[in-house]
């Protein structure tokens, strides 16, 4: 009789395991989206900054030589890269609100 009770009580053991797996999957997907966002930011923000500064800001509004425009655009791109990296490090160090992981055995 004890096996009947165990089977009856243990039949619902699959649902919490599946719910836990879905929870882990959603956490993994959320982490993937965050890392993908910061990777895209780190790659594309400096490139976009370089060409926006070069093409729209420095060439049209300031009357300086081509070499100085390129140097100023490169400096702007480096600053943009450091800002993106700083945002990523800040997010990685302090974490998102409510992302405190709980240990499960």
UniProtKB/Swiss-Prot annotation:
Name the residues that span the membrane.
37-57, 69-89
- For the Lumenal compartment, the record's topological domain ranges are 58-68
Q: Name one GO biological process term.
A: vacuolar proton-transporting V-type ATPase complex assembly
Which UniProt keywords are present, listed alphabetically? Cytoplasmic vesicle, Endoplasmic reticulum, Membrane, Transmembrane, Transmembrane helix
Keyword Zinc tagged: no
Give membrane topology per the record. Multi-pass membrane protein
Source organism's superkingdom? Eukaryota
Write out the ranges of the annotated region (Disordered): 1-26
The answer to whether UniProt assigns keyword Glycoprotein to this entry is no
Where found?
A: Endoplasmic reticulum membrane; Endoplasmic reticulum-Golgi intermediate compartment membrane; Cytoplasmic vesicle, COPII-coated vesicle membrane
InterPro entries attached to this UniProt entry: Vma21
> In which broad location class does this protein mainly occur, judging by the first location in its UniProt entry?
endoplasmic reticulum
Q: Which GO terms describe its cellular component?
A: endoplasmic reticulum membrane; endoplasmic reticulum-Golgi intermediate compartment membrane; ER to Golgi transport vesicle membrane
Topological domains (Cytoplasmic): residue ranges?
1-36, 90-105
What is this protein's function?
A: Required for the assembly of the V0 complex of the vacuolar ATPase (V-ATPase) in the endoplasmic reticulum.
The record's comment on protein family reads:
Belongs to the VMA21 family.
Q: What is this protein called?
A: Vacuolar ATPase assembly integral membrane protein VMA21 homolog
